[in-house]
Amino acid sequence: MRTKLDGRIRTQIENGVASGHRSMFAVVGDKARDQVPILYHILSKSTVSARPNVLWCYKKELSFSTHRAKKAKKMKKATTTISGSLPDADPFDVFISSTQIRYCYYNETEKILGNTFGVLVLQDFEAMTPNLLARTIETIEGGGMVILLMQSVRSLRQLYTISMDVHNRYRTEAHNEITARFNERFILSLASCSSVLVLDDQLRVLPISSHIENVEAIPASQKKIQSESDAELASLKEAMKETKPIGPLLSRARTACQAKALLRFLDVITEKQSNVTCSLTAGRGRGKSAAVGLSLAGAIAFGYTNIFVTSPSPENLKTLFEFVVKGFDALDYQEHTDYELIQSANPEFKNCLVRINVFREHKQTIQYISPTDVQKLGQCELIVIDEAAAIPLPLVKELISGPYISFLSSTINGYEGTGRSLSLKLLQQLRQQSAGGEAKEGKSASNKGKTLHEMHMEESIRYKPGDKIEKWLNRLLCLDATNCQLKLECGTPPPAACELYIVNRDTLFSFHDASEAFLQQVMAIFVSAHYKNSPNDLQMLSDAPAHNLFVLMAPIDKSRKTIPEVLAVVQVCLEGRLDSDNIQNGLESGKRAAGDLLPWTVSQQFMDKQFGTLCGGRIVRVAVHPDYQSMGYGGRAVQLIEQYYLGLATSLDEEEKAPAPPSKTVIKQVKDGHTVELLEERIEPRADLPPLLQRLDERKPERLDYLGVSFGLTVPLLKFWKRNEFVPVYIRQNSNDITGEHTCIILKGLEHGGSDSDEEPSATWLPVYWREFRRRIVNLLSFDFSSFPAQMALSLLQLKNKHVEKQMKRLVIERSELAIHLSNTDLRRMSQYGRNMVDSHIITDILPIVAKLNFEQRLPQELKLAVTQSAILLARGLQHKHFEDISKELDLPMNQIFALLTKAIRRIGDWFDEVCETAVRENLDKEAEASAANKPTSSLPKAVPLANLEDELESAAKEIRARHDRDRKALLAELGNELQKYEIIQDEKELAEAYESVNMKYANKLVSVKSKRTAIQAAIPDAKDPANKNAKKKKRFSSGGRR
């Protein structure tokens, strides 16, 4: 039975083709698939170009055969019957066999990036996610259409409660009731767009689309009106028409934004300065890859020899290489004659282009490389990084650090969750380097001071400006949050005066005008303050039962009737309360359920199944308004959340309120017996909604045992959380593929009832976790964490939680344990180095041991080192960095590095010596006591000292002095008899006579005086006596005989 088609459908499609805008049709019913050929036929008749190609996305099964050969054979077999008549072929089979259709699984839609289609068909509504919507709809060109196939329902309100596949990820053991707020908002949004028609499976317009009761066709006169952008593009092409090779390349540009970007690229190429970086950012489908591809063709024309292109996958470079070839066509290059195309032999890349060899004038190459192949850029002259936001930031920094021109292109708006990292981190560092400043991290001598050219493209390449589907999608998924006005009029109130409110998610996602404005403001703060965002986060925030949203606001002026201004937004997820048996089974099997990130991770790392039974709150993100960052508002929000879950925010003036049940959306269930026909149903936002904001003292909180955070480890974030007394317990050894950061988990125990209460969660498990974490980090700093800045590593090992510090006992090392780590020779080497008697390489092997003992707090508190000394000891002893690297990192000269290390080693070495001396003294005392105890007992009384030590020493000194006097006198007496024989015995009278008889002027200073010898002198024989001489001679001859 044939029915007349609603004229609004045809008019809608024709208007889209005429204006270059897209149309969308949501078809509800079991036979919705059969209406696709009809809509496609209308579109193909309305266009003057070739039949549009189709992208058909589905979950698992298509429910029909896609084999074109079998379809053609079946149709040929059925063309004739026995009677010879020609039956009517199935329109759907004709459509499948005669149309260029690309079938794609939902989980493989990333492979369609950069492609353009005329028609999009989305089936399996329950498997769709916000990411899929944004990713697929943006591939449709202007004049095309999106067909959304929905299952048969009695009422559109049944779609509110439909179970989506993604909801399985949101369910946890403690929170398993899902409220599909996103579906309700999605259905309501369809009625807000004039380019969306909701139809049944007979192509009848449903009342939800009553806002477009009369669709007027676009007059022919308006179709020929040229926009300002088109006029600007035409003038640019005309101005550069005679300039080669720029003119022919510019003729391929489709928009004015693309033409300006291409001109900037070509200007940089013609200047041939190797210290230039160009950044091109835009939303999805703005023609970035096309502009880069045309610029590469221009680089070949200007004589560049070695050009490299990189991307997360070669499949993403299809459009880029396509426009390189189009650029060659514009420059009259002939394939096989002037250049050749090389496809990849890797089956994973599916015959993608990976190389273009040009040999028109000399050998030139455009080569694809993997982002990890930085070592292949030795002879590079120009490198292009397409979709740079999807490549880890450390790799991007390394790729652009060489002495060559760098082109970056990336999508910063749209569905990509990583696009903001390019603008928030990398481009900020490049701006600092371009301005002559030094980047905070990732500083390199080769890219320091590079000139940066930033370009941004606004106009879409696939459709004309003013596309209503784009506006609808941006509003639904908050994709244009970066363009939201964030200027606040509340000034800068003191953080202590600000208040925290909990947001009612039923009202927030109700699609009311006021709540939509508030939602856009919240998402704008999320996007501008946090670099990792995606539309899927929006669905998680709306539907996940364990998530709560808090906003920090300035004191509200009740006289104003505007939307409250938000200073900070905090998203909290409740986790834990797991069954211990489930945890044990998960730990043994290595599998875990979705959700509950902190309980599962901590339980697995510490092999503690009891931790998962606790109830905790994970702070998913803290986002502060970009104009109010680093002013204390983020810390104030965290402080208020802690007080809220401790029960300190509850009003004392009111009676105790019952615990607030989880927020639920009240949706009227539509049963078969009480259904409303689709053609009579009108869908509108609900009116019976609670207030959007609720004070904390109006809602009794859940009882939590801890608060936790999982974040990408950076120095500023670590300082922020430690300032709020959070304790790190886990760091992932593998870095994040996108940001290059290591995931860190930090916890803070909530002590209900104060420190005197018997319930002190942090008193039982958190100190144990911290001690174990500290021990692991000390050992891992020489492995996966050796690249950490010394400042970050030192901050990880410093505890700032007062409750945990009170329970931490410092286990000072003893002599017996010290001997296991350090020998006596090691201690002597330390002592010598501390006194500058040996070089530093003498103690290189000792530094890891000393550093480990220091940072594991095995040394006494009074031996605490200065911060700089600790950083040097950590960097050298634990991370094994070279002194040159330490000097650059700490910005200290080498002599100060050595001096500070020497002082630290001397202090520690002196304490080690003191420990050894004390141990020796104690051993001697013990031996003396043991020897005294082992002596046999006697009848004599026990000896008692008669005097103290000083008296004994004085007595001994007197005895020694007396002995010395006695020995001296004996020596003088012995020598005196021998010396008397040389004594001159004369009186003064004889001497005076001698002096008078001699003239002293001419004397030779000798005076002779006659004297008489004493008896002793007479006994001595005179050697001059002849008798004595003869006696000596006789004695000689008698002994020797004659000769």
From Swiss-Prot:
GO terms for biological process: ribosomal small subunit biogenesis; rRNA acetylation involved in maturation of SSU-rRNA; tRNA acetylation; tRNA wobble cytosine modification. GO terms for molecular function: 18S rRNA cytidine N-acetyltransferase activity; ATP binding; tRNA binding; tRNA N4-acetyltransferase activity. It is found in: Nucleus, Nucleolus. It is an enzyme of class 2 (transferase). Pfam families: GNAT_acetyltr_2, NAT10_TcmA_helicase, TmcA_N, tRNA_bind_2. GO terms for cellular component: nucleolus; small-subunit processome. Its EC number is 2.3.1.-. Residues 1020-1043 are annotated as: Disordered. It catalyses: a cytidine in 18S rRNA + acetyl-CoA + ATP + H2O = an N(4)-acetylcytidine in 18S rRNA + ADP + phosphate + CoA + H(+); a cytidine in tRNA + acetyl-CoA + ATP + H2O = an N(4)-acetylcytidine in tRNA + ADP + phosphate + CoA + H(+). Gene3D superfamilies: 3.40.50.11040, 3.40.630.30, P-loop containing nucleotide triphosphate hydrolases. Keywords: Acyltransferase, ATP-binding, Nucleotide-binding, Nucleus, rRNA processing, Transferase, tRNA processing. Acetyl-CoA binds at V622, A623, V624, Q629, S630, M631, G632, Y633, G634, G635, R723. Residues 551-736 form the N-acetyltransferase domain. Residues 1030-1043 have a biased composition (Basic residues). Belongs to the RNA cytidine acetyltransferase family. NAT10 subfamily. Part of the small subunit (SSU) processome, composed of more than 70 proteins and the RNA chaperone small nucleolar RNA (snoRNA) U3. RNA cytidine acetyltransferase with specificity toward both 18S rRNA and tRNAs. Catalyzes the formation of N(4)-acetylcytidine (ac4C) in 18S rRNA. Required for early nucleolar cleavages of precursor rRNA at sites A0, A1 and A2 during 18S rRNA synthesis. Catalyzes the formation of ac4C in serine and leucine tRNAs. Requires a tRNA-binding adapter protein for full tRNA acetyltransferase activity but not for 18S rRNA acetylation. Part of the small subunit (SSU) processome, first precursor of the small eukaryotic ribosomal subunit. This is RNA cytidine acetyltransferase. It comes from Caenorhabditis elegans.
